C-alpha cells in the first residue's frame, strides 16, 4: 500500500553534515528525511537501507547498512533522521545510496528509492596513502644526495693531495 498523498525528500550526509566525508574506517552517516502528508498523532517507522550505488544500478545490490527510526508524527509535515554506521573497507572510493520506506502498522505507506538521486548518494573517500620508508619516491633523491656527498669527498681528498708540499 503506497499512499500517493505522502511525499518524501531526503539528504544523505556524514555525521558532520558534509556530502564529502573524510576517510574513516567506520563512516557515520545520517539520512535526513522531510515528509509531507502523514497523519498527525499516528505512529510511523522509517527504515533506511544503504547500498553500493553501482550494484543498485546493476540490480545486484544487498544493503551494506540498515537503520530504523520510530516516531509519532507531530504534524502532517516534518523531518526525521535515520543514522547509519558502515565499515568502509570494501566501499573505499565508491558511492553509496540510501533508500527509505515509511511504514504504519507494519504496512509500507511511502518510499523514496532513486539510485540516481545525488541527494541520497554520498562518495566514500578512499583511504589516504601515507608514504612509507621503502617508497620509491624517496630512493632517487637519496641516491643523488649520496652521490653528491661522495663526489664532494673525493674532490676534497684529491685537492688536498695536490696542495701538499713536496
Region roles according to the model:
Residues 9-19, 131-135:
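Short, solvent-exposed loop/edge segments of extracellular or virion-exposed proteins
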Residues 132-146:
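Juxtamembrane/start-of-transmembrane alpha-helix segments at the extracytoplasmic/lumenal side
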Residues 148-166:
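C-terminal membrane-anchoring or membrane-association module
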Residues 20-32:
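Contiguous beta-strand segments within globular domains
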Residues 69-80:
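Short proline/glycine- and polar residue-rich coil/turn motifs
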Residues 36-38, 74-76, 85-93:
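Short, surface-exposed loop/turn segments at beta-strand-coil junctions that are enriched for proline
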Residues 49-56, 85-113:
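Enriched for extracellular/lumenal, surface-exposed ectodomains of secreted and cell-surface proteins
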Residues 1-5, 108-127:
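Short beta-strand elements
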Amino acid at each position: 500500500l503506497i499512499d500517493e498523498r505522502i511525499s518524501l525528500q531526503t539528504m544523505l550526509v556524514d555525521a558532520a553534515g558534509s556530502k564529502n566525508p573524510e576517510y574513516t574506517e567506520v563512516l557515520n552517516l545520517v539520512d535526513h528525511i522531510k515528509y509531507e502528508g502523514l497523519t498527525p498523532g499516528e505512529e510511523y517507522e522509517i527504515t533506511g537501507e544503504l547500498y553500493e550505488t553501482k550494484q543498485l544500478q546493476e540490480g545486484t545490490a544487498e544493503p551494506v547498512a540498515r537503520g530504523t527510526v520510530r516516531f509519532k508524527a507531530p504534524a502532517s509535515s516534518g523531518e526525521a533522521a535515520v543514522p547509519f554506521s558502515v565499515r568502509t573497507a570494501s566501499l573505499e572510493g565508491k558511492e553509496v545510496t540510501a533508500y527509505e520506506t515509511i511504514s504504519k502498522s507494519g504496512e509500507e505507506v511511502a518510499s523514496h528509492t532513486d539510485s540516481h538521486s545525488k541527494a541520497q548518494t554520498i562518495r566514500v573517500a578512499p583511504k589516504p596513502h601515507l608514504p612509507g620508508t621503502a617508497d620509491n619516491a624517496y630512493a632517487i633523491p637519496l641516491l643523488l644526495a649520496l652521490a653528491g656527498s661522495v663526489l664532494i669527498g673525493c674532490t676534497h681528498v684529491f685537492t688536498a693531495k695536490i696542495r701538499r708540499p713536496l
